[in-house]
From Swiss-Prot:
Name of the protein: Casparian strip membrane protein 1
UniProt function note: Regulates membrane-cell wall junctions and localized cell wall deposition. Required for establishment of the Casparian strip membrane domain (CSD) and the subsequent formation of Casparian strips, a cell wall modification of the root endodermis that determines an apoplastic barrier between the intraorganismal apoplasm and the extraorganismal apoplasm and prevents lateral diffusion.
Main location per the UniProt record: membrane
Residue intervals passing through the bilayer: 27-47, 73-93, 108-128, 158-178
Localization (cell): Cell membrane
Name of one Pfam family that matches: CASP_dom
Assigned GO CC terms: plasma membrane
Assigned keywords, A-Z: Cell membrane, Cell wall biogenesis/degradation, Membrane, Transmembrane, Transmembrane helix
Membrane topology summary: Multi-pass membrane protein
Extracellular side: 48-72, 129-157
Homology family: Belongs to the Casparian strip membrane proteins (CASP) family.
GO biological process, one term: cell wall modification
Organism: Medicago truncatula
Length: 186
């Protein structure tokens, strides 16, 4: 017998270690998907329920700020909701990867869909971030004045929802890297 061959009944340490590492990566993928789903859900709910009325409004004229006044915020809520739904559905495949660590085609599909969802989420967060910046600082050249001094609660909530969305984008990057690492171990 050659020195490198395995006899009947023996298990290669590399194969069992590799399978354990892939299982660990799959469990980490599952956990990160749950956290990202919670972050996108919280961002969508925080932005979607944001509105504020100024207290000095008269019965004829009321000053209010709501998320649906701006299309960028509506896009943000829709994108976060879509990504949250996707993450909930992708948990099924993530569980499959924990059970069967050799599934490669479904991992490739998840990587592609994860990149699409990350792009959608990053686009929505960036569009909303530009509006949040103008709400905080205004643009004197265009005569757009900052509104956050008057609508403080509104601005705090929309800024907080952006943080949750950007956390989800960062988690998507980690999820994609973990999936690619698991595929490369095949």
């Amino acid at each position: 017998m050659k020195g490198g061959s395995i006899e009947l009944g023996e298990v290669s340490k590399n194969a069992s270690t590799n399978k354990g590492v892939k299982r660990g990566l799959s469990i980490m993928d599952f956990i990160l998907r749950i956290i990202a789903g919670v972050a996108t859900l919280a961002s969508a709910v925080a932005m979607g329920t944001t509105d504020e009325r100024l207290p000095f409004a008269t019965s004829f004229v009321q000053f209010r700020a709501e998320y649906d006044d701006l299309p960028s915020f509506v896009f943000f809520v829709l994108a976060n909701s879509i990504v949250c739904g996707y993450l909930a559905l992708s948990l099924i495949l993530s569980i499959l990867h924990i059970v069967r660590s050799t599934a490669v085609k479904s991992r490739i599909l998840l990587i592609v869909l994860d990149m699409v969802m990350m792009g959608l989420l990053a686009a929505a967060a960036s569009a909303a971030a530009s509006i949040v910046y103008i709400a905080h600082y205004g643009n004197t050249q265009a005569n757009w004045f900052p509104i956050c001094q008057q609508y403080n609660s509104f601005c705090e909530r929309i800024s907080g929802s952006l943080i949750g969305s950007y956390i989800a984008v960062a988690l998507f990057i980690i999820i994609i890297l973990l999936s690619q690492s698991a595929i490369s171990r095949n």
